[in-house]
Amino acid sequence: MTRPGLLMILCGTMLFSCSSRKAQEPQNIGINLENIDSTVRPQDDFFKYVNGGWLNRTTIPADQGRWGAFNELREFNNDVVLRVLKKAGENVVLYPEGTDQRKAADFYSIGMDSMLVENAGMQPVERFLAKINAIADKDEIYRYLAENVLVGGSAFFDFEVFPDLKNSKKMAAYVSSGGVGLPERDYYLKMDEKSRETRDKYRIHISNLFKLAGDAEDKAASSATTVLALETQLAKSMLSKEEKRDPVKLYNPKVITELNNIAQFVHWKEYLSILQAPADTIIVSEPEYLKACENVVHAYSLDDIKTYLKAAVLRRSAPFLHHAFVQESFDFNTKYLKGTDKMLPRWKRVLAVTDKYLGEAIGKLYVEEAFPAEAKEKALEMVENIKLAFADRIKLLDWMSDSTKHMALAKLSTFSVKIGYPDVWKSYSGLVIEKSPEQASYFTNVINAASFHVQDQIQKLGKPVDKSEWDMTPQTVNAYYNPLFNEIVFPAGILQPPFYDYRADEAVNYGGIGAGIGHEITHGFDDQGSQFDGEGNLKNWWAESDLEKFRAKGKAYADQFSAYEPLPGVFVQGEFTLGENIGDLAGLTIAFDGLQRYFKQHGRPDKIDNLTPEERFFMSFGTIWRTKSRDETLRSQILTDPHSPAVYRINGPLSNFEPFYETFHVVAGDSLFRPVSDRVKIW
């Protein structure tokens, strides 16, 4: 529950990916002319023009599914984090026993003890499997499900705590679909050859996990078949990923009696009592899915349900157990699904888990090392210029009524901005890291950390929301907009070259992180964010005629992206990616306007490397999204990720943006040219 699944759907983010390879410190931000491919005209393919040189000389590391600017910066940040974490571990004077930084260092150190993990074998997970074996009848399933939530597990559905969508000042309980092993509903339901193959591979994967847990081959194969069939039944009642983008559909408050009518097997009052969750109402994101859980429990035998629950435990545990489990998890989830040939080295895997569970303890050290105060001050100035530019845009819109403009400007005026790191650091005082030879294991500490975060969230139920909290750690190379807080958050981790350098040319900064800032701001006004008001509540503030015009513009933009074909027969899903695509176009637009405001304040700079400020702006925009992907990673992204492939995140918005046409003299006949009537202009 460090970042709830349903909340992740609602929050707009810039990009999700992992990193690898030996880090090189990012160069001082600017336009690297060696990355340009002069054989490509910018008017035809700006992505290849700006990045062609880089694409030609870059090989995706064997332990990565894709590689780009985000990965390169993550590599650099990984090295910084590892360095400061090791220093903390060695300095018992500054970080004595009981301090959060000592806990982070100990968590990492125990995770790195591969001999300890190998010697433990299956022992760390046996108590969880024993709990499943002890379920005597179906009336006891709810008890296991509740206890499983308390250790961060998921089966049948997810229980989460975050602000009430319609009363964002109060924390609420949510139940959403979950507890299946494939990434998304369509993996279970599509009937094309690749989807069928994936399900077969998944069945083999589950069988292998059962064999590693000690089952005979025949029993393991039979169990895997049962698991796939049961999960498929659950998937049939899930909302599509496009439907999940509608927060109105996800908001279905139910009192206990209503919940018992939907899914009686849970025994909701007792379930909440075990969780010590003081709630008499739960917001159900997918009532039909919850009904499907009830039907599955009735239709399947207790033994089959136990088999499903065991598979969920083994899937979750595998990355933290002995090598054979880790390898099996990698072979299916990363190698097969994403096409990555090589596993990340252990230190990177353990560091990522340490960051997930003790991220702010590490973040405090990272900020001291890598984020000076001046960097925060200049970033805040940039945010203000871009916000003002957006306000100007709203005032001049010819398709929006004055009443809706008034509400939009009111929402923008209440935007909260978090830059760099939290004002108040999270305390991990209640987290126990086992270090004694009798108790210590990597998996045990993962469970302890997960349990700490779950209980930390549950105890907030019914209480006022603490808006000072962050949903990303300071070292994260990403950013987000949270509609429930009406805030944008930019961690120190992404406020680094090549995205941002407080010492560098502002045209490049505005084209880089500035476009990202604009992207996140405008998430508050995309197909999801536009349904929340300035207080963060799910509330329509649009005139109906304006909403119809907005949707029509969005439909036209979605249709453009649906025509892109990254792989043969595999098209971008324009409706699914619409929010992020609007964010890219709008972010580009208001960042460009924000740069013009900066020039009025500070003067217009000269050419650099014979490039005008506008050319540098656009080239920086093209640079930050440079990415090479393996086909399987790209396929997985298209199926599960609301972000479009990198080439379209560049060429798509630019082909609709008039200043790009003016700067690079794009005319009819050029590949990026669109007739004026076809260009989408939303903000």
Positions of predicted regions on the chain:
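Intrinsically disordered, low-complexity linker/terminal regions across diverse proteins
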Residues: 5, 227, 262-265, 283, ...
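Hydrophobic/aromatic-rich, well-ordered segments within soluble, folded domains that form packed cores
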Residues: 35-56, 192-211, 578, 585-590
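C-terminal motif of bacterial Sec signal peptides marking the signal peptidase cleavage site
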Residues: 15-17
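Short secondary-structure subsegments characteristic of cysteine-rich extracellular domains
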Residues: 10, 63-85, 219-237, 509-515, ...
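Noncatalytic, helix-rich "gating/capping" subdomain that lines the substrate-entry/channel surface
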Residues: 88-385
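Active-site-surrounding "flap" and adjacent substrate/cofactor-binding loops of secreted or lumenal enzymes
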Residues: 25, 38-44, 49-116
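Sec-dependent N-terminal signal peptides
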Residues: 5-13
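Bacterial Sec signal peptide processing site at the extreme N-terminus
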Residues: 19-28
